[in-house]
Amino acid sequence: MIEETVTIRDDRTTLVGFLEIPSTPAGIVLFSHGSGSGRFSPRNRFVARQLHQGGIATLLIDLLTTEEEHRRNVFDIDLLSDRVLMASAWLREDSRTRALSLSYFGASTGAASALQAVAQASFGVSAIVSRGGRPDLAERYLPHVTVPTLLLVGGEDHPVIEMNQQAYRLLGGPKQLMIIPGATHLFEEPGTLEQVAEYALKWFRQHFARPD
């Protein structure tokens, strides 16, 4: 198991993340975090651990720098999707990950940035899983999302259910909307986050393919 803190740079920005690669991984999942969250998110780290046990590598990354973490940037989907693409390009170049099929896991506003990134990507992405996502924030890109997309929403998260139902109708590829009974937006109820991890693992393993 490789466990490493990595730094991803371009001419203007430096991002920091956790790269974890189990032996003989089936693929790698890039986590696109939601508002006010990052690589230390306990919920996303829980999901990542379950993916590791299922033979999937992960990259959890802070999409915003410390200087950028003021409130308006957490809803700047254009900026966040650019960072998802920046991290994806790094994965496509790193010798440890470039041969791995790439998928995205997005939470809250991070789901919107992942969906927009897929629609804009010049490389292959195998699948997307959204946990309590806000795909409505990337509405104009949804018809261009043709990769298999799983939308997971808590059964008690009523406003977000409606947003995901509307987004589901707009998505341009294979898709599934799953409501997890008894779960609220953060999936804090016993057993609900375990269901998220289980469904995500199954979806990724089902749809992983060699990148273009």
Model region roles, listed by residue range:
Residues 103-106, 131:
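Short beta-strand immediately N-terminal to the catalytic nucleophile in serine-hydrolase-like folds
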Residues 6-100, 186-191, 195-196:
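Serine-hydrolase catalytic machinery in alpha/beta-hydrolase-like enzymes
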Residues 145, 151-153:
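Short beta-strand/loop motif that positions the catalytic acidic residue
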Residues 171-186:
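Catalytic histidine neighborhood in serine/cysteine hydrolases
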